[in-house]
């Protein structure tokens, strides 16, 4: 029993040759624990909580909150979401980190996470997106490149390739369900596959310095592609996005959630409401939440046909 416990705990403790995976898993778990400690729901956090903690959401991400493309990869929608993602991460991490090393593992998680967030913003910027799955798909994409281009021992390659393809295929098909951000999965997978090819090419050089140089050049190239794409998205935001941001910054969102707006409108004392020609005063009537799961954004969707989901 003691051996089993120690074996399980070893997945979360960095050691030589296995550093990045446990650290990244620990960060994801720690963020979730801090969220819970601050009052966020353990099984189904509210939309407002996710946005406050850094979920990816086009009207906010593309109008100043660029950091959401990073933070969204460490935030999860409940304990089950975290558990499933960390299990998948642990599986690929055990296999992949031995091949590419800790530095590349760290960079891969962050880079493919950025690319998955950007592709999600491009495909449906109104979707509230969180979770490590975009980065995890990126890591599976890297491993897939290694399998296809023969960097894995032949006797292991077929079984691993079958396993990875089943995992990726199942999750992409399952991701067609409503409420799952398949665009992030695809963006992560494609960017990971390209990054994996770059790493494979780098390993064709015998000298470690040459391998490292190829890797870094490739990583910088992918980051530049992300940066260029993100700048284009920011430059071409729909007209509604800046208005939604005003709603967010004015405190109207929390007012709706807390059932305060109707009272504030009656008293006409809320400066943020009166200061701008905001969306709520023009399009959304007075509103009181009807349940714990009822949020300003879900009501906003019903009232104005603006799609908000995660």
Give each language-model segment a name.
Residues 20-132, 180:
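N-terminal TM1-TM2 helical hairpin plus the immediately adjacent luminal interfacial "cap"
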Residues 151-170, 174-182:
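Membrane-embedded catalytic cores of phosphoryl/pyrophosphoryl-handling enzymes
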Residues 82-91, 130-142, 181-200:
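Alpha-helical transmembrane segments that form the membrane-embedded catalytic/substrate-binding core
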Residues 11-25, 103, 157-161, 212-216:
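Membrane-water interface of alpha-helical transmembrane segments
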Residues 34, 115, 119, 123, ...:
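Alpha-helical membrane-inserting segments
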Residues 1-14, 173-296, 300-304:
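C-terminal transmembrane module of polytopic alpha-helical membrane proteins
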Residues 105-108, 132-136, 157-162:
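Cytoplasmic-side transmembrane-helix entry/capping segments in multi-pass membrane proteins
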């Amino acid at each position: 029993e003691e051996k089993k416990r120690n074996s399980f705990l070893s997945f979360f403790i960095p050691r030589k040759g296995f550093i990045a995976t446990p650290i990244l898993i620990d960060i994801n778990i720690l963020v979730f624990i801090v969220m819970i400690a601050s009052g966020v729901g353990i099984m189904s956090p509210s939309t407002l909580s996710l946005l406050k903690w850094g979920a990816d959401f086009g009207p906010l991400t593309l109008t100043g909150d660029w950091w959401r493309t990073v933070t969204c990869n460490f935030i999860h929608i409940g304990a089950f979401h975290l558990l499933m993602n960390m299990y998948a991460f642990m599986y690929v991490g055990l296999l992949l980190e031995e091949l590419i090393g800790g530095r590349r593992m760290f960079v891969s998680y962050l880079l493919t996470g950025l690319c998955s967030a950007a592709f999600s913003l491009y495909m449906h910027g109104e979707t509230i997106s969180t979770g490590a799955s975009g980065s995890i798909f990126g890591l599976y994409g890297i491993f897939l490149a290694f399998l296809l281009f023969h960097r894995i021992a032949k006797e292991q390659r077929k079984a691993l390739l079958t396993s990875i393809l089943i995992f990726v295929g199942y999750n992409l098909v399952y991701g067609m369900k409503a409420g799952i951000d398949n665009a992030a999965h695809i963006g992560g997978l494609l960017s990971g596959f390209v990054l994996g090819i770059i790493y494979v090419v780098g390993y064709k050089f015998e000298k470690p310095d040459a391998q490292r140089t190829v890797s870094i050049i490739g990583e910088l190239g992918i980051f530049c592609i992300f940066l260029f794409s993100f700048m284009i998205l920011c430059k071409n935001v729909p007209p509604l996005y800046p208005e939604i941001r005003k709603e967010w910054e004015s405190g109207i969102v929390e007012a709706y959630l807390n059932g305060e707006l109707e009272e504030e409108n009656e008293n006409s004392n809320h400066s943020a409401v009166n200061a701008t020609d905001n969306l709520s005063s023009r399009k959304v009537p007075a509103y009181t939440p009807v349940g714990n799961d009822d949020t300003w954004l879900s009501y906003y969707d019903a009232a104005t046909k603006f799609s908000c989901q995660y």
